[in-house]
Amino acid sequence: MSALGAVIALLLWGQLFAVDSGNDVTDIADDGCPKPPEIANGYVEHLVRYQCKKYYRLRTEGDGVYTLNNEKQWTNKAVGDKLPECEAVCGKPKNPANPVQRILGGHLDAKGSFPWQAKMVSRHNLTTGATLINEQWLLTTAKNLFLNHSENATAKDIAPTLTLYVGKNQLVEIEKVVLYPNYSQVDIGLIKLKDKVPVNERVMPICLPSKDYAEVGRVGYVSGWGRNANFKFTDHLKYVMLPVADQYQCVKHYEGSTVPEKKTPKSPVGQQPILNEHTFCAGMSKYQEDTCYGDAGSAFAVHDLEEDTWYAAGILSFDKSCGVAEYGVYVKATSIQDWVQKTIAEN
C-alpha cells in the first residue's frame, strides 16, 4: 500500500487481536486490552476494518472488513488475504467555483476551487498550464511541452527543461514526458512525476469522463495562470465560466483549420488553430471574458450535478483568443481517454 494513501485500521475492542479456536480464544497481541465477555452457545469473532485518510477512498472489491481465521491470517470474504488500496479522490473540490468569475483581469480563485490546476514554467520562463489527473500524472498540450524547443526535440530532451508547481506553489519533480502519437493533430502530452503528490484540499486530481460533456451550450470553468487584460502573466490563479460553442460556427470564424497550428492572416488573431473531430470550441462569456496566452493545458471543468463531481471535458489547446477572437479550442477528453489509461498502465 502506498504511504500516501496509507490505510488506518480500526479494530473492534481497541487493539485486541484474537482467533476463535473451538471454545478457546487465543490472544496474539496487546495484553493490556481486555477480552470481551463470552456468551452461551456463541463465540467472539474479531474483525478489522481498513479505512482511508481524508481525500482518499478504498479501491477494492471487498468492503474493507477482514476477519482472523484459524491460521491467524486476516482475510476478506471477497478478496481473501489481498489487502485493499487507497486511491485519491478526484473531482471533489472543497470550495467549488462560483459563477461569473474571470481570467482576463478579474476575480481570484477561492482556496481549493481548482485543486487540479498546475503551473508549468518552460524554458526561458514562459508560464503555461497543466492538469492533475491522478496522484502522479498530469495532462498538458504538446505545444506547451515544445515551447522554446525545436521540432526535433524528444520527450527526453524536454522533461529536464520544465518546472512544475501544484497546489500553493508546491514544486514537484518531473520523471518523464510522453507525447501523444499524433500530437500535431491531437495537441496533448502527459507528464509523469517522480513521486506521488499527497492529495489534500489544495491538491486533488480532476476526474476524466466516460462520456462526452462537450455539448453545445454546456458551461464549463477554465482556470489559469495566463496573461491578464493587460497581457501580463498573473501571479494569482484566476478562472472564467464559458459555454461550449457550435463547432461549425467556430470553424467558420477561423476560416478553417491548419495542422499543425500556424500563423495566417485569415485568423482574427493571426494564427489558425487545430480544429477536427478531436476538438471542441468554447465561446466568450456574456461579459466578454476569455482565456489568453499561458492558459493552455488547463482543463475545461464541468460539474456533473447528479454525481456532484467535476470532470475534465477537455484540455485548452488554443489559448490565443484573448478576447479578440470569439472561441478558444479544446482537445476532447474522450478522444484521449484510452491513450491516457494505456500510457499510465505501461509507465
Swiss-Prot record:
Extent of the signal sequence: 1-18
InterPro entries for the chain: Haptoglobin (IPR008292), Peptidase_S1_PA (IPR009003), Peptidase_S1_PA_chymotrypsin (IPR043504), Peptidase_S1A (IPR001314), Sushi/SCR/CCP_sf (IPR035976), Sushi_SCR_CCP_dom (IPR000436), Trypsin_dom (IPR001254)
One GO process term, biological-process aspect: immune system process
Gene Ontology MF terms: antioxidant activity; hemoglobin binding
Domain of life, per lineage: Eukaryota
Location(s) in or outside the cell: Secreted
Alphabetic keyword roster: Acute phase, Antibiotic, Antimicrobial, Antioxidant, Disulfide bond, Glycoprotein, Hemoglobin-binding, Immunity, Secreted, Serine protease homolog, Signal, Sushi
Disulphide-bonded residues: C52-C86, C90-C207, C250-C281, C292-C322
Main location (coarse class): secreted
Expressed in which tissues: Expressed by the liver and secreted in plasma.
Domain Peptidase S1 intervals: 103-345
Entry function: As a result of hemolysis, hemoglobin is found to accumulate in the kidney and is secreted in the urine. Haptoglobin captures, and combines with free plasma hemoglobin to allow hepatic recycling of heme iron and to prevent kidney damage. Haptoglobin also acts as an antioxidant, has antibacterial activity and plays a role in modulating many aspects of the acute phase response. Hemoglobin/haptoglobin complexes are rapidly cleared by the macrophage CD163 scavenger receptor expressed on the surface of liver Kupfer cells through an endocytic lysosomal degradation pathway.
Assembly mode: Tetramer of two alpha and two beta chains; disulfide-linked. The hemoglobin/haptoglobin complex is composed of a haptoglobin dimer bound to two hemoglobin alpha-beta dimers. Interacts with CD163. Interacts with ERGIC3.
Record remark: domains: The beta chain mediates most of the interactions with both subunits of hemoglobin, while the alpha chain forms the homodimeric interface.
Name under which the protein is recorded: Haptoglobin
Source organism: Ateles geoffroyi
Organism classification: Eukaryota, Metazoa, Chordata, Craniata, Vertebrata
